[in-house]
């Protein structure tokens, strides 16, 4: 009899679920802002609890501002997962181990923000034993060195930020003002507004790096996610409107901001590549097309091209389910 394993990745903005039974899998991607809806998490998960034998869990939502501490977040998330499923729950930690839910609560810092490590361990076991894993999601970009199947990354988000292994820039949710405070416009180096007018999703859509369907987060102004709405938001970063700035000028402006995004990713990956003498890169996440532009000088292996877009958009949930499946098969 085949075992049904549910891999769950609970992020601050998105929850991703992978159902794995033997070689068959199905992936669910749900926009679920925990800072607004954390009390509805149990009900959400109950929609996926049919015939589940094991749950493999990773999380980053414990960092959401609905929780005062990581301890509170980890405990609350695990409690809600346990209530939603009538089966064993295993939580993947930053050391590459599966913990019982009780062990995970006691060692809450070890399971905090552990989703990147599940992806890295999966890549090391199933794809490439020496490489840099670059996972660009909606909000952040993980840059993980792997050598001889060993994940060499720092363990906490703070240490990863300090060592070029975590960049707080993503395909969708990053405010444009994070990318630059000045951009050349009409021949002059021009100051930009730091108001929450536009996000990387607007640039990504304008430049055809994502589809409207991929734009899953809320828009800064509550308006649409179409090309015209994205241009309308972007022009506000110049404290202007569509009557003052032509569309071709705005597209050029978007390209200049996009190049700043590419530079930010490239300089961090370059640092890791030199530090660990690595030149193969495995890319995954919503931002794969952006990563291809940023890292065109590297040997690239795409999870999207290897496993499909669904897996690329939900790699940690797929990875943690595959890793538990492998462990149970031993």
From Swiss-Prot:
- Protein's UniProt name: (4-{4-[2-(gamma-L-glutamylamino)ethyl]phenoxymethyl}furan-2-yl)methanamine synthase
In its UniProt record, a GO molecular function of this protein is: hydrolase activity
| NCBIfam families linked to this entry | MfnF (NF040623), one_C_unchar_1 (TIGR03123)
Q: Answer yes or no on keyword Transferase.
A: yes
Reactions catalysed, semicolon-separated, are:
gamma-L-glutamyltyramine + [5-(aminomethyl)furan-3-yl]methyl diphosphate = (4-{4-[2-(gamma-L-glutamylamino)ethyl]phenoxymethyl}furan-2-yl)methanamine + diphosphate
Q: What does this protein do?
A: Catalyzes the condensation between 5-(aminomethyl)-3-furanmethanol diphosphate (F1-PP) and gamma-glutamyltyramine to produce APMF-Glu.
Keyword Transferase assigned? yes
Judging by the UniProt lineage, the source's domain of life is: Archaea
Any Pfam family hit: Hydantoinase_A
Taxonomic source organism: Methanocaldococcus jannaschii (strain ATCC 43067 / DSM 2661 / JAL-1 / JCM 10045 / NBRC 100440) (Methanococcus jannaschii)
Which protein family is named in the record?
Belongs to the MfnF family.
What EC number(s) is this enzyme filed under?
A: 2.5.1.131
Q: In which pathway does this enzyme or protein participate?
A: Cofactor biosynthesis; methanofuran biosynthesis
User: Which terms are listed as keywords in the entry?
Assistant: Transferase
């Amino acid at each position: 009899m085949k075992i049904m394993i549910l891999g769950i990745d609970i992020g601050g903005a998105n929850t991703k679920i992978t159902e794995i039974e033997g070689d068959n899998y199905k992936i669910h991607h749900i926009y679920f802002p925990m800072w607004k809806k954390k009390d509805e998490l149990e009900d959400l998960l109950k929609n996926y609890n049919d015939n589940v034998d094991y749950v493999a869990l990773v999380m980053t939502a414990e960092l959401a501002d609905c929780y005062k501490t990581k301890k509170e977040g980890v405990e609350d998330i695990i409690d809600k997962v346990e209530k939603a499923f009538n089966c064993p729950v295993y939580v993947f930690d930053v050391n590459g181990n599966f913990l019982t839910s009780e062990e995970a609560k006691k060692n809450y810092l070890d399971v905090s923000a552990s989703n990147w490590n599940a992806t890295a361990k999966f890549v090391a076991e199933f794809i490439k034993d020496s490489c840099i894993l670059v996972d660009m999601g909606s909000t952040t970009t993980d840059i993980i060195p792997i050598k001889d199947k060993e994940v060499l990354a720092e363990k906490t988000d703070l240490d990863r930020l300090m060592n070029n292994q975590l960049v707080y820039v993503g395909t969708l949710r990053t405010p444009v003002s994070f990318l630059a405070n000045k951009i050349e416009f009409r021949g002059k180096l021009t100051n930009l507004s730091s108001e929450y007018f536009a996000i990387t999703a607007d640039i990504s859509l304008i430049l055809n790096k994502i589809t409207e369907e991929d734009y899953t987060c809320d828009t800064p102004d509550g308006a649409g996610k179409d090309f015209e709405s994205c241009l309308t938001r972007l022009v506000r970063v110049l404290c202007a409107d569509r009557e003052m700035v032509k569309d071709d000028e705005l597209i050029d402006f978007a390209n200049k901001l996009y190049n700043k995004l590419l530079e930010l990713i490239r300089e961090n990956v370059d640092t890791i590549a030199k530090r660990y003498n690595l030149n193969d890169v495995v890319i995954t996440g919503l931002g794969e097309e952006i990563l291809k532009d940023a890292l065109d000088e590297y040997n690239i292996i795409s999870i999207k091209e290897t496993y499909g877009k669904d897996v690329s958009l939900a790699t940690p949930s797929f990875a943690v389910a595959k890793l538990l499946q492998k462990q149970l098969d031993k």
